[in-house]
Structures are given as structure tokens and as C-alpha cells.
Amino acid sequence: MTDYDVVIVGGGAAGLMCAMEAGKRGRRVVVIEKGKVPAGKIRISGGGRCNFTNIHCTPNHFHSENKHFAKSALKRYGPNDFISLVENHDIAYHEKTLGQLFCDNSAQDIIKMLLDECEAVGVVVKTSMTVEHIDKNETFNVLTSDGMISASSLVIASGGPSIPKMGATGWGYDVARQFKLKIVDPVPALVPLTFGEAFIFDFRALSGLAVDIRVQCGKTSFDEALLFTHRGMSGPAILQISSYWRSGMDITINLAPNRNVFEELKIQKEHQPKQEIQTTLSGIIPKRLALYLCDHSGVSGTLADLSHKKLKIIADLVNVWRITPNGTEGFATAEVTRGGVSTSELSSKTMEANKVPGLYFIGEVVDVTGHLGGFNFQWAWSSGHAAGQFV
């Protein structure tokens, strides 16, 4: 049996951050990673350049059953703290849009930074190793594929089941259940939405088309880009709203935000009555989409031929298009997982399980889900840092 102070299961963003922070405190730390190399999701994120944080990050950018849970960790270790770390390692970066920070070169820069920090404080990182069993007496005994490891603190940083091709599973939830902790049902988040067969047939004609929209589900809305795909809808707007969508709910799409299309059509009818409705709409939204909506609504002809009632029908499809998804593309393409270990079971200051001293949960395995744009990485850094001060 090998003894450490801290065993961290999961060598991703949260796990490595926790490891280096615990190591700075003189703790003997081992990270167990089942993959051949650590930080797999960092490597593929942001098109290989890693959207490592967002300078506008606040607790309001996170979804959880307890909307206040993330406040403590984010306050103690925020975007500026991680940016300072990046700058100390001379990693070049840039702001792409909406506060999203990316590496100029490669996500590998972030991975090397984390591993260098871990190495500097004596953290041991073991790859291609799986956990077979865990039990707790005075310490945690972790049976791995390479023998038994004992430690006073056990950190679960194994993520959620999103992107299973990277080896992602819901293993961390099994550990939580073993210790009688509540789980908020995990579902795919930041994921494309799908529609019925009739819609799929229609959407194929729009595949590849992108348009800036406002999308709303319930009381939540986002102004971002929509991308039509051969399977349904994707793009930042849809990925964002997917975290708030539930089965059976409508989403409302405004294809021309900040424009009153009905009023514009009435004015255009007065000035150019012989203009075809498709032509008029093509001046407001992309032509392919204008043709689709006219076909979809059965509204066609010149503006002079169309009553205000008909104009209102087509205008509402532009400004208030209500549509009901029949599902999502699932964990296979989901960027993150919504749900996880209930925050009611954890200390927001330390990430320690209230009922199991020495057991910690950090990162995606916890019921804290960020918006698209670097927020989930910031939660990984913040929660990992928080636990690293106490393990």
C-alpha cells in the first residue's frame, strides 16, 4: 500500500488545479488519471486553443439548484487570478469575443503550465490507471489497477458523462451514491437540439446557415448565433439555451432582434406594393431562411396581395418563432453535464462533503454548470483551488 495525504481521481482542469494548490501547502498528492495522458478535454477545447476563462465571469453565469453555491469559490479565485497564472508562464492569449480568452498557440500551453506547476510541488500524476474500489476507515483506501493507495483526503474530479469518446463517464456519481450523497439527475448541456422528422426534412435545406438571433426558454434568453444543421439546430445560441430547456418546453426564436418586422412589412407594402414577400423578407433575414419561412407558413405573393393578417403570420415567424424540440443530441456531443452531486451535500467554501469528512467533489461532477464561453473552465479552476486549500 502507498500512502499519500491526498488522492485526486481525475487529471483534468479541476483535478490538476487542486493538486498544485494542495502541493503548495506541502501535501503529498497523487493524481489518478485513467487516460493515457492527462487533461484530455483541455486539449480539444476551443478548437484546440482552449477558451480557458471569461473576463466577465460572475455567479450569474452558472446554473445550479443552488444559484448561490458558486459565489464563494469564484470570489476567492476568479478570472484575474487564473490570467495572472497564465501570464506568469508567458502564455500568449487573446480575447475572441464576449470576454472569451483563448491561447494564441495551443491548449497544450495550458496543460504544460498545470503539469509544470504540479511537478514543481512534487505532485505525482499517474496515467492509464483506473479505480476499482474505494472504502473508508480512518483513511480512504483506494484500490487501483496498480495496487492500493491510502490517503486522508479523497478528491473526486472525474467530470461528467459528456463527450464519452474522451472516456467520460458518470463514475463520480457512483462514488457519491456509495457515500449516500444526493445526485441531481445529470442531463446533457451546451448541446444541439433536435426536432421531429418533418422538421429535420425541412432543416436540411437550411443546413450550414448561420444567423444572429435572440432565443428564449422560460425566462432565460441569449443573443447569440444560431446554426442550422442537417439534424436540427446548433450554434452558441442553441447550446446556451439547451442548459435551460426541459422536455416538452417550447423555445422562442427571434430571427431579427430589435426589429419590428410586422411594422416594417406594413411600411414596405405602402411603398413597394408589387414586391414579393420573399424579396422583402430577404432584406431582413438570409434569403434561404426567408424562402423557408414563406413555404412553412404558406404565405406567398406580392405585398399588395397580402392582408395585414397574413403579414402578421410571417412577421411572427421572424420575431416570435415558437418551436418545440423533441430532444438533444445527448452526451455524445454535449460540451458539459447539467446536474451532478447536489450542492446541498457540499461546503461551498471547501467542496468537502458535509457528511463525509475528507471527501471532496470539484469541477463538472458537481451540480454547477456554466454558460458557453470559458465559464466551465473557470468553475474548474475556482472549485479546484477552493478544495486545494483544505485537502
Explain the meaning of each model-derived region.
Residues 4-31, 387-391:
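N-terminal Rossmann-like FAD-binding beta1-loop-alpha1 element of flavoenzymes
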Residues 7-9, 131, 149-165, 176, ...:
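Short hydrophobic core segments
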Residues 23-47:
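Glycine-rich FAD pyrophosphate-binding loop
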Residues 36-38, 43-44, 52-59, 92, ...:
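An anion/pyrophosphate-binding glycine-rich loop and adjacent beta-alpha core
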Residues 47-97:
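Glycine-rich active-site loop/strand segments that organize a redox cofactor
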Residues 76-153:
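Feature captures the FAD/FMN-dependent oxidoreductase FAD-binding
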Residues 127, 291-369:
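A glycine-rich dinucleotide-binding beta-alpha-beta segment and adjacent secondary-structure elements
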Residues 153-197:
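Glycine-rich loop(s) and the adjacent beta-strand/alpha-helix scaffold that form part
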